[in-house]
């Protein structure tokens, strides 16, 4: 049984809390793309956890977590994340955390280059809003075949040293000529690799073989995505995307079992919209700055990885319908419905108005999207606390109507509705 948990929008939809909830019925949770540039926040009886690299299933003692070959992994950040978790009583060992030998290493010079390039672009207003975690440069060097993989940390021999020398030589051309920086030291990079070789070699293995056997044995495997459909490198709002494929079709590939097919695709979407970074975000035009400030505070909309204030707006049915299509969703989870408890009327962006005066419900790209204006429908709010509700029929009628209206607009059934951050604060519809 292979299930994907993916984001419908720009990321920050609440995937971590849903993985934490649903993983109780799974044997394995695998991340298949991305790095430490976004965070999954989980709140349970042991406290609040922010996970950037490790799958959210790590909070379940009987679940094995896998970091797939489609990921880019900063060993330095991974060490800190493991330390943070173990300090809160989470047990982590090679028995419950397996790292793909094919995953790309985010090196210190990737992080440095990311910050330098964003600074250079900002001088002309051309920045992308990067998290400065080195993600794009890790993936870029992966495709240029000028970086190391986690498997290299297992065999730190003369061959790996020679490759590192070639990589650093090439990188120094960029660091010195473009950014005017001091050259990267091969010896320092080798010492850095040796440190993390000793730490992570026991965790590194052929996760594809492990997942293949598990699937054939009938184990239940969940694939956890980072970010959302609109950040996918191919299907997102280019160039304001991440540098990996966030769509569900890539899940078996990035995890390590490309010949296997998904059995279930669950999409996660918020009851409103949020976005971190640059690029068109049509829905934010449907609210005043004051209204957005109130929504941001009610939703605590600040990046889990960066702390940056998120851009916010009403639920965007145009973007969400496109996200559902990209993810091939069989069912949906609607998160943070309780955040809207304060609204007398709840706005929904149902279409975009284009510069020629026409309207569309299809998600456009390029300049058409840049210039689009939101078409807004308002529905009655419920103006009461719903955090204690656990059955759909016990929700206020206005809240029920809002959920069914979103189903109509995106064309997919909403099975799960979260009404609070706690693990059990969720309605499961029959």
Show which residues each predicted segment covers.
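Non-transmembrane, aqueous-exposed alpha-helical and coiled segments at domain scale
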Residues: 1-430
């Amino acid at each position: 049984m292979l299930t994907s948990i993916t984001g419908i929008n720009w990321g920050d939809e609440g995937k971590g809390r849903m993985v934490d909830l649903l993983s109780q019925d799974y044997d394995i949770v695998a991340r298949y793309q991305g790095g430490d540039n976004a965070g999954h926040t989980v709140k349970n009886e042991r406290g609040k956890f922010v996970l950037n690299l490790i799958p959210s299933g790590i909070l379940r003692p009987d679940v094995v977590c896998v970091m797939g070959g489609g990921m880019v992994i900063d060993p330095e950040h991974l060490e800190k994340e493991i330390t943070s978790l173990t300090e809160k009583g989470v047990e982590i060992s090679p028995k419950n955390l397996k790292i793909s030998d094919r995953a790309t290493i985010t090196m210190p010079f990737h992080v440095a280059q990311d910050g330098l390039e964003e600074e250079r672009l900002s001088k002309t207003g051309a920045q992308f809003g990067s998290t400065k975690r080195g993600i794009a440069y890790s993936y870029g060097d992966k495709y240029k075949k000028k970086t190391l993989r986690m498997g290299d940390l297992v065999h730190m021999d003369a061959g790996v040293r020679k490759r590192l020398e070639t990589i650093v030589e090439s990188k120094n051309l960029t660091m010195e000529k473009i950014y005017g920086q001091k050259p990267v030291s091969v010896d320092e990079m080798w010492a850095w690799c040796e440190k993390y070789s000793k730490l992570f070699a026991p965790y590194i293995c052929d996760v594809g073989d492990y997942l293949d056997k598990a699937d054939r044995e009938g184990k239940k495997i969940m694939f956890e995505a980072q970010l959302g459909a609109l950040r996918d490198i191919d299907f997102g709002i280019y160039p304001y995307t991440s540098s990996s494929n966030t769509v569900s079709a890539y899940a078996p590939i990035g995890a390590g079992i490309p010949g296997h097919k998904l059995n279930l695709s669950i999409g996660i979407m918020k009851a409103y919209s949020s976005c971190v970074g640059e690029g068109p975000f049509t829905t934010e035009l449907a609210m005043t700055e004051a209204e957005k400030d109130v929504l941001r505070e009610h939703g605590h909309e600040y990046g889990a990885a960066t702390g940056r204030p998120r851009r916010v707006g009403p639920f965007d049915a145009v973007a969400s319908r496109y996200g559902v299509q990209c993810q091939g969703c069989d069912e949906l989870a609607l998160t943070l419905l309780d955040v809207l408890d304060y609204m007398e009327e709840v706005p929904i962006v149902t279409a975009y108005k284009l510069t020629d005066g026409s309207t569309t419900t299809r998600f456009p790209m390029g300049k058409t999207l840049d210039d689009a204006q939101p078409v807004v429908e308002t529905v009655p709010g419920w103006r009461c606390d719903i955090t204690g509700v656990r059955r759909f029929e016990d929700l206020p009628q206005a809240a029920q109507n809002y959920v069914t209206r979103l189903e109509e607009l995106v064309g997919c059934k909403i099975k799960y509705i979260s009404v609070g951050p706690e693990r059990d604060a969720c309605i499961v519809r029959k």
